[in-house]
């Protein structure tokens, strides 16, 4: 078991090969609660997160909100460090790699739902569930699609993008 996304990189050389491969990684670092309970994850990044928060325009109204938000940012920094991709460039895999990143839910672990609504500028709880899905590969210009999709769309998207041989009757999405 692991707590830090960075620990997964310790096994990178066992995952990567010169042959095409697929790896599915679920990270834990961004999950709440955003309290001292998750210090293993947030502590390495707290000082930097505090510096960022001090210059932000996030509309917190209490020190407790500020601390919880700061810890969430620190935990996100752990995942950012893992996703950074320097390791792909260092071993020459960046040009033949596709990264797909998605979250399964919004930051529902915050103790104050109204605070999250204020940050996102959205009060409809259903709309708060809109989460990003990112597909990255070297040399492709960034694009934004604002269509509503679901996690059930990911597998058919992968099949289509890579022209995989698949019986689409068994896929929904």
Task: Describe the residue ranges of each PLM region.
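Solvent-exposed soluble domains appended to multi-pass membrane proteins
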Residues: 1-173
